[in-house]
From Swiss-Prot:
Residues 55-113 are annotated as: Involved in cell filopodia formation. It comes from Homo sapiens. Pfam families: PL48. Residues 474-491 have a biased composition (Polar residues). The gene is RIPOR2. Phosphorylated. Isoform 2 is phosphorylated in T cells. Chemokine-induced phosphorylation of isoform 2 in neutrophils occurs in a PKC- and AKT-dependent manner, resulting in RIPOR2 interaction with YWHAB and stabilization. Isoform 2 is phosphorylated by PKCA, AKT1 and MAPKAPK1A; in vitro. One of its GO terms (molecular function) is 14-3-3 protein binding. This is Rho family-interacting cell polarization regulator 2.
Length: 1068
């Protein structure tokens, strides 16, 4: 957030200085509006300092690569670095133009010495610009190599998913081992390139300009500033002089930029030898520091913005003390050469990245039509190797064929990637996979099938010139019994469809609801042309055959467009009948409210990110935080490593096909001809940094130049079949393959985030934090169970006892839960469904003892299971869900084994609450005086009602409750329960409940809550601040002392409070 802006002109050739400022990480969810200007102590006395000390001399330069690559962060830093280098070039080009113009004007009437100096300056700038250009080329080269390794890693990852969904076999296991090895190699290459790129980031020169504050800086105050950036440190001390100036023992330092890492700044006020008061601590983003001109920034040290640290930061593209090439330059070149060899059969050419990518474009003869060569490459490498080895063990060594071979294939009469508008011939394609389950087969118009002796996975491509009689000869070997059974199956109650409608690319597929279709049997006298599928002929669907154990060949028509789209369409449509039969056993959610389904749209990623962000600053504070972080990371790893088993076998099969084909989409660089003049190489994307970009702008520009281009395979899959990812190479969404389990994980991640926020807020009140940590410990156990379920029985658990084995000991609770959840969603149940089941099972019993209280009792129970501060409203029930782990954990923690008896106890609570709410004035006063503390249940609903009665405007009601709470507080058991509940209420987000809890704590004289009240005094809501301050002042000498210290150093009191677990990065 921009909190201050000013101009700074140190002089020199840089001219006007651009200035920005930042606020760092904010502890509050919403910052208060602040003034844009502040009082600055412009003149700061500097103590004499020795030669500038470089941080990397202390061991910063560590060539050990990181364990995990950070591709998103690398992309951000690369963009910022490129912008900074381009800006440097622009600045120096402007300076060069100015000096050149001066030189021309001075040549006639100037002395030789002046001309010599000016010419010397021009040559210096030119040399520097050439060095900048070379530096940019090195950065581009590394980033291009990084992009390739990233794409290869994504491809290997998706191949792992494809193999995980296929039947297990020895060849598959060997292939999976090889792919894992390749995945590890690509990951190590990415980490190595990150280290090499980090060495090209230059250095940041940071100058201390002093502190500024609104009446916070007094003469004699001493401050210590500690800056941390990765392994680099800078500590300096300063003092505020009598004349308002400042003296610091350090003036300037140098930090080497890091790809991963932020600058952490901590300011401490030194009161004495052992007294140090933390003024503030912030963490700052560094991307915007890559600028050609020095920047003066103002850092907000505290949340109120009353203390600011002024720094002047200058970025230099080169390490001024290390003008020579890095010691690892030879290793880097060797590594790049090794990586380049994977994409070229011969000696790799030196890439320039400004004009073309790693891959050479093919140049067919002008009289031949432009064709894509990826199919030819696949035919010569992928298919051939697959046929020979029957496995994918050598996939990492796949690479495009030599140019001569590719041109041979590209000159075929028809290319299967064309739309077929001008094609007059059709190319029959026969594909067979024997390792697909269920013995699925496809019957063509002649019931073509693979020979009985063909048992290995095989993909064959038959060109148009191929003699069709060879195909007919294959049909003679097919078993007559199999043909007869196929014909009989077609005749039993199944009607053929005359035409399969084209699906809308934007409409999601619903394989479970589509009707079953049969293969249409053509007459045996049909000609050879019937081997091809026409638009008016029903598409052949995959059908289960008891006798067949392999997939019969599928004839595909090249005139219908992309082979991949046809293949996916056939495979997915063939699985429609099985999807209906498997729906119940797969465990996919059906028939639940829309509120439940809304959690499936990208919520798993959001829930993981929210919890990890809340844990990150505080995970070392408690052992429970560390355990939770470990379990959450373990669950996240399981979901990332597991294949995305979708809602049915149909989409799972589509994912397998798509993953295998799109993994290496980036290798599909079309071999289009040169431009019209034939002299230039086709440059797609228009820049060094756009070779592997998938942005919409580049996609449209690519297609506008080449309208016949089909784009990425994954994009075509999405448009024509409705399955697959929307952007090529994008990561698949996290999912367990079971919607009910997904919703359950999201709910518990969100609840853990809420608990972490409350624990951080109450960290200075041990008994409150201890109670909340107990709840968090139970959630850690839940996370462990969720990870086990997701890892071992992904999406296939149909019994609650399998998820929670201890459930069989509580049969009444288990019986009720099975009535609440649907057969296909055992992990959760909508809250309104739980309410309806409670009414159906227990409404008569509750109303018999407490007439008319059944509905509030049930809503109270559901609210307590969800750990809500107040009963749920009827309107919000439809959007809430109860998970089986919440249900079981609640009753276990309360020692409940019989639901009916527990509802009777809860009804007593609700009855007393309604009694207190309905009484007024004298009746309430009389009732409260008659109640003894031992007779009043110290339960959540009763305590909440008593506190809310204190907020009424009626003084007599408030007085009655005050007298009762004061008397009840003498009972130790009641006071402990009330104190814990009201302190926990302070951590809730309900403002009315926070206000009521403050008033109740005031009556209880709860000095134990002072630290939490001090935190609440910094609330954004004025009403809450006033009530908390009044309560604080009423708590005797300790409360008054805490309130007085609040004005002196608020950050020391609220450095944890007010931070609800989320921090926002703020750029310079």
């Amino acid at each position: 957030m921009l909190v201050g802006s000013q101009s700074f002109s140190p002089g020199g050739p840089n001219g006007i200085i651009r200035s920005q400022s930042f606020a760092g990480f904010s502890g509050l969810q919403e910052r208060r509006s602040r003034c844009n200007s502040f009082i600055e102590n412009s003149s700061a006395l500097k103590k004499p300092q020795a030669k500038l000390k470089k941080m990397h001399n202390l061991g910063h330069k560590n060539n050990n690569p990181p364990k995990e690559p950070q591709p998103k962060r690398v992309e951000e830093v690369y963009r910022a670095l490129k912008n900074g280098l381009d800006e440097y070039l622009e600045v120096h080009q402007t300076e060069l133009d100015k000096l050149t113009a001066q030189l021309k004007d001075m040549k006639r009437n100037s002395r030789l010495g002046v001309l010599y100096d000016l010419d010397k300056q021009i040559k210096t700038i030119e040399r520097y610009m050439r060095r900048l250009e070379f530096h940019i080329s090195k950065v581009d080269e590394l980033y291009e190599a990084y992009c390739i390794q990233r794409r290869l890693q994504d491809g290997a990852s998706k191949m792992k998913q494809a193999f995980a969904t296929s039947p297990a076999s020895k060849a598959a296991r060997e292939s999976l081992t090889e792919i894992n090895r390749s995945f590890k190699e690509y990951t190590e290459n990415m980490c190595t390139i990150e280290v090499e790129l980090e060495n090209l980031l230059g250095e940041f020169s940071i100058k201390m300009k002093g502190l500024a504050g609104f009446a916070r800086l007094c003469p004699g105050d001493q401050y210590e500033i500690f800056m941390k950036y990765g392994r680099q440190r800078w500590k300096l001390k300063g003092k505020i002089e009598v004349n308002g100036k400042q003296s610091w023992d350090g003036e300037e330092t140098v930090f080497l930029p890091l790809i991963v890492g932020f600058i952490s700044i901590k300011v401490t006020e030194l009161k004495g030898l052992a007294t140090h008061i933390l003024v503030g601590s912030v963490t700052c983003e560094t991307k915007e520091l890559f600028a050609a001109r020095p920047q003066v920034v103002a850092v907000d040290i505290n949340d109120l913005g009353t203390i600011k640290l002024n720094l002047e930061i200058t970025w230099y593209p080169f390490d001024v003390e290390d003008m020579t090439a890095s010691s690892g330059a030879g290793n880097k070149a060797a590594a790049l050469q090794r990586r380049m060899s994977m994409y070229s059969q011969g000696t790799p050419e030196t890439p320039t990245f400004k004009d073309h990518s790693f891959f050479r474009w093919l140049h067919p003869s002008p009289d031949k039509p432009r064709r894509l060569s990826v199919l030819s490459a696949l035919q010569d490498t992928f298919f051939a190797k697959l046929h020979r080895s029957r496995s994918f063990s050598d996939l990492p060594s796949l690479r495009p064929s030599p140019k001569a071979v590719l041109e041979l294939y590209s000159n075929l009469p028809d290319d299967i990637f064309e739309n077929g508008k001008a094609a007059e011939e059709k190319m029959p394609l026969s594909l067979s996979f024997s390792d697909l389950p269920n013995g699925d087969c496809a019957l063509t118009s002649h019931s073509t099938g693979s020979p009985s002796n063909s048992t290995n996975p095989e993909i064959t491509i038959t060109p148009a010139e191929f003699n069709l009689s060879s195909l007919a000869s294959q049909n003679e070997g097919m078993d007559d019994t199999s043909s007869a059974s196929s014909r009989n199956s077609l005749g039993e109650g199944q009607e053929p469809k005359s035409h399969l409608k084209e699906e809308d690319p934007e409409e999601p597929r619903k394989p479970a609801s589509a009707p079953s279709e049969a293969c249409r049997r053509q007459s045996s006298g049909a000609g050879a042309e019937h081997l091809f599928l026409e638009n008016d002929v029903a598409e052949a669907l995959l059908q289960e055959s008891e006798e067949a154990s392999e997939l019969k060949p599928v004839e595909l028509d090249t005139s219908e467009g992309n082979i991949t789209k046809q293949l996916v369409k056939r495979l997915t449509s063939a699985e429609v009948p099985m999807a209906t039969d498997r729906l119940l056993s797969e465990g996919s959610v059906g028939g639940e409210s829309e509120g439940c389904r809304s959690f499936l749209d990208g919520s798993l990623e959001d829930a993981f990110n929210g919890l990890l962000l809340a844990l990150e600053p505080h995970k070392e504070q408690y052992k429970e935080f560390q355990d939770l972080n470990q379990e959450v990371m373990n669950l996240d790893d399981i979901l990332k490593c597991k294949p995305a088993v979708s809602r049915s076998r149909s989409s799972s099969l589509s994912l397998t096909v798509e993953s295998a084909l799109e993994s290496f989409d980036f290798l599909n660089t079309s071999d289009f001809d040169e431009e019209e003049d034939g002299d230039e190489v086709c440059n797609v994307g228009g820049g060094a940094d756009s070779v592997f970009s998938d942005t919409e702008t580049e996609k449209h520009s690519y297609r506008s130049v080449h309208p016949e281009a089909r784009g990425h395979l994954s994009e075509a899959l999405t448009e024509d079949t409705g399955v697959g990812t929307s952007v090529a190479g994008s990561p698949l969404p996290l999912t367990t393959g079971n919607e009910s389990l997904d919703i359950t994980i999201v709910r518990h991640l969100q609840y853990c985030t809420q608990l972490v926020q409350q624990i951080v807020f109450s960290s200075k009140t041990p008994f409150v934090a201890r109670s909340l940590l107990e709840k968090l410990s139970r959630q850690i156990q839940v996370m462990e169970k969720l990870a086990a379920v997701s890892d071992e029985n992904i999406g296939n658990i149909s019994s609650v006892v399998e998820a929670i084995p201890e459930f069989h000991k509580k049969l009444s609770l288990l019986s009720f839960w099975t009535k609440c959840c649907s057969p296909v969603g055992v992990y959760h149940s909508p809250a309104d469904r739980v309410m309806k089941q409670l009414e159906a099972s227990f409404a008569r019993t509750v109303n018999k003892e407490y007439p008319g209280l059944a509905d509030p009792v049930f809503r109270t129970l559901v609210s307590q299971i969800l750990d809500r501060a107040e009963p749920l409203l009827s309107s919000s029930l439809s959007s809430e869900v109860v998970t089986v782990f919440q249900y079981y954990s609640y009753f276990t923690s309360h020692g409940v084994s019989d639901l009916e008896s527990y509802l009777s106890q809860l009804a007593r609570q609700v009855s007393m609450v309604q009694t207190l709410q309905s009484l007024r004035d004298e009746k309430l006063l009389q009732t409260m005086s008659d109640l003894a503390p031992s007779n009043l249940l110290a339960q959540q609903e009763v305590l909440r009602t008593l506190a809310l009665l204190l907020t009424r405007e009626d003084n007599e009601v408030s007085e009655a409750v005050t007298l009762y709470l004061a008397a009840a507080s003498k009972n130790q058991h009641f006071r402990e329960k009330a104190l814990l509940y009201y302190c926990e209420a302070l951590t809730k987000t309900n403002l009315q409940l926070q206000k009521a809890a403050c008033l109740a704590l005031k009556i209880l004289e709860a000095t134990e809550s002072i630290k939490m009240l001090v935190t609440l005094c910094q609330s954004d809501t004025e009403e809450i601040r006033n009530v908390a301050s009044e309560t604080l002042l009423s708590l005797g000498e300790d409360g008054r002392l805490a309130y007085e210290q609040l004005d002196k150093f608020p950050r020391d009191c609220v450095k944890v409070g007010g931070r609800h677990g989320t921090e926002v990065a703020t750029a310079f």
